[in-house]
Amino acid sequence: MDEEASRTARESLELVFRMSNILDTGLDRHTLSVLIALCDLGVNPEALATVVKELRRESIPDSVTTTPSIH
């Protein structure tokens, strides 16, 4: 990658990261970079969004998602 293309890629990632923060997505630069690369390879962005949501749902501890039982 030449210097200009590298600079443009960094600026684009920074812009996407700022937008991500405004939207409070919780995604870091590395994750956003991977998602962008997958989109560039032709992966459906809506499918990626679904996967990210599902992975987040699975990563929430059970104690947070369930109500405590009253004995």
From Swiss-Prot:
Pfam families: MOZART1 (PF12554). Keywords: Cytoplasm, Cytoskeleton, Microtubule, Nucleus. InterPro entries: MZT1. It is found in: Cytoplasm, Cytoskeleton, Microtubule organizing center; Cytoplasm, Cytoskeleton, Spindle; Nucleus; Cytoplasm, Cytoskeleton, Phragmoplast. The keyword S-adenosyl-L-methionine does not apply. GO terms for biological process: CENP-A containing chromatin assembly; centromere complex assembly; gamma-tubulin complex localization; microtubule cytoskeleton organization; microtubule nucleation by microtubule organizing center; mitotic spindle organization. Signal peptide: none annotated. One of its GO terms (cellular component) is nuclear envelope. One of its GO terms (molecular function) is histone binding. The keyword Aminoacyl-tRNA synthetase does not apply. Mostly expressed in siliques and flowers, and, to a lower extent, in leaves, roots and seedlings, with highest levels in young tissues and meristematic cells, and the vasculature. Disruption phenotype: In the gip1 gip2 double mutants, embryonic lethality and impaired development of male gametophytes, severe growth defects and sterility, characterized by microtubule (MT) misorganization and abnormal spindle polarity, resulting in ploidy defects. PANTHER family: MITOTIC-SPINDLE ORGANIZING PROTEIN 1. Belongs to the MOZART1 family. Homo- and heteromultimer. Part of the gamma-tubulin complex. Interacts with TUBB2/TUBB3, GIP2, GCP3 and TSA1 (via C-terminal domain). Required for gamma-tubulin complex recruitment to the microtubule organizing centers (MTOCs). During mitosis, modulates gamma-tubulin complex localization, spindle stability and chromosomal segregation. Necessary for gametophyte development and embryogenesis. This is Mitotic-spindle organizing protein 1B. It comes from Arabidopsis thaliana (Mouse-ear cress).
